């Protein structure tokens, strides 16, 4: 009987304990005039932002696992590709009243989403959401085609309590990114052949000079090359694990 009781108790504890992955997530916290902003890397391009009692989920896509994290008040999507959206995860991370904001190209598939295009702004509660360009300059699957056409997907600048957070989406070293101003935290992609090299990403980051830069969507890129490229600029580089095992 004692052994059965022990097994039962252990099973119950395991059921209610957060997963190892949830416990080990490298959560980042940033200050704003409206209170702290907590950002949780989930996987690849998927992340969760919490501030003021509200939750924003960005690019919910498999194999991201949101176990132990709250469901979204807002889901923000950057592009049509499968590493940026998955209908089953969008449903799983939604609750009553969840809003979805996405580029018009995504709205064709995610029909409950509200569209936002490059250059447009929306106010969502205490947040300002600005859609900015993300696209390829030269890289594509074949001559005359690009992986990401200009205007199809969105990068985003999210502002809360005066703190400005940039999400690059899938992009190369484009003029619009280089011209960004007053970015506090930048999430910048890099991986070939779809976006850019670490060296190109570093060159872009040096141009708009955020206070903090966090590489994401990096796959097997050499992050040391990115760090080397940004060294000596005064920009803080935070290298996080976006590809947890298990």
Label the model's feature ranges.
Residues 18-22:
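Sec/Tat signal peptide C-region and signal peptidase I cleavage site
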């Amino acid at each position: 009987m004692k052994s059965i009781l022990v097994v039962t108790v252990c099973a119950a504890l395991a059921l209610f304990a957060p997963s190892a992955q949830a416990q080990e997530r490298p959560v980042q916290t940033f200050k704003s005039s409206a209170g702290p902003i907590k950002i949780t890397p989930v996987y690849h391009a998927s992340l969760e932002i919490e501030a003021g009692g509200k939750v924003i989920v960005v690019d919910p896509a498999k194999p991201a696992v949101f176990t132990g994290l709250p469901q979204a008040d807002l889901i923000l999507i950057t592009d049509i590709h499968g590493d940026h959206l998955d209908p089953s995860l969008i449903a799983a991370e939604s609750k009553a009243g969840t809003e979805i904001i996405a580029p018009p190209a995504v709205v064709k598939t995610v029909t409950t989403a509200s569209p936002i295009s490059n250059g447009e702004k929306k106010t969502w509660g205490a947040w300002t959401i600005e859609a900015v360009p993300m696209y390829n300059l030269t890289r594509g699957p074949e001559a005359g085609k690009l992986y990401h056409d200009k205007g199809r997907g969105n990068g985003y600048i999210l502002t809360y309590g005066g703190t400005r957070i940039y999400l690059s989406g899938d992009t190369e070293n484009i003029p619009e990114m280089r011209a960004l101003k007053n970015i506090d935290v930048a999430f910048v992609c890099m991986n070939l052949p779809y976006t850019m090299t670490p060296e190109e990403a570093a060159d872009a980051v040096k141009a708009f000079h955020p206070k903090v830069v966090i590489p994401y969507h990096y796959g097997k890129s050499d992050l040391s090359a990115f760090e080397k490229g940004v060294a000596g600029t005064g920009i803080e580089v935070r290298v996080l694990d976006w590809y947890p095992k298990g």
